[in-house]
Amino acid sequence: MNRYDRAITIFSPDGHLFQVEYAQEAVKKGSTAVGVRGKDCIVIGVEKKSIPALQDDRTIRKIHMIDDHVMLAFAGLSADARVLVDRARIECQSYKLTLEDPVTVAYISRYIANTKQRFTQSPGRRPFGISMLIGGFDHDGTPRLFKTEPSGAYYEYVANATGRGEKPVREYLEEQYSEENTVDEATTLKLVVKSLAQVVPPGSQNIEIAVMKKVNDELQQRVLSTEEIEALLKVVETERVAAEAEEAASKKK
């Protein structure tokens, strides 16, 4: 095996590119991120890990705006993400200057994926150790959500997760996602919080959430405050307790 993981451009006999697989392992050690596409909104939530007491938490951001209508979250190496975020922002500006239209979410997702793929095929480089959830709105007001992998693969989803808690969160989303649960901002927010709760300890200090939605043909985006997240967690907990009580009562009958 050691002969085949020394260079990024060498396949193993059974078809593996080990450096790409190692990059995927870096993603699996990253903070959990989840994205959900609602009827008229995109909600992205990420796990916030504890930081040193002397560190300014404003320098720790897992959710980034790359244009007025596109945002992303990532899991993996923060330094790698910073490089790709900067490249994506420049590409958004270049696209708008050239074509006089904002980028589509699919275009910028493909651009990021292509950049990642080039780093899996060039000697003297290494793959980006990050996976990204990219959400936003196209010109016609359609919400879109994409996920990119270290290999350069990218796909569109209605909901997905990445990072260390990807598997349990994705399984929860597969069970709970529906049009009814994403009919508006409030229901979509609850779904994101409940899915993160599968792997993240309760508490507003452990979660960061950003919302992008279309209101009267105008896009609005914001990051929820600690107070808003705390209130949302209380609502979710109240609903959970009520559901458990109802289930217990039905069993007694």
Swiss-Prot record:
Keyword annotations of the record: Cytoplasm, Nucleus, Proteasome
PROSITE patterns, per the entry: PROTEASOME_ALPHA_1, PROTEASOME_ALPHA_2
Top-level taxon in the UniProt lineage: Eukaryota
Gene label: pas-4
Primary role: The proteasome is a multicatalytic proteinase complex which is characterized by its ability to cleave peptides with Arg, Phe, Tyr, Leu, and Glu adjacent to the leaving group at neutral or slightly basic pH. The proteasome has an ATP-dependent proteolytic activity.
CDD domains assigned: proteasome_alpha_type_7
GO biological process: proteasome-mediated ubiquitin-dependent protein catabolic process
Subunit structure: The 26S proteasome consists of a 20S proteasome core and two 19S regulatory subunits. The 20S proteasome core is composed of 28 subunits that are arranged in four stacked rings, resulting in a barrel-shaped structure. The two end rings are each formed by seven alpha subunits, and the two central rings are each formed by seven beta subunits. The catalytic chamber with the active sites is on the inside of the barrel.
Protein name listed in UniProt: Proteasome subunit alpha type-7
GO cellular component: cytoplasm; nucleus; proteasome core complex, alpha-subunit complex
Species whose genome carries this gene: Caenorhabditis elegans
Keyword check for Ribonucleoprotein: no
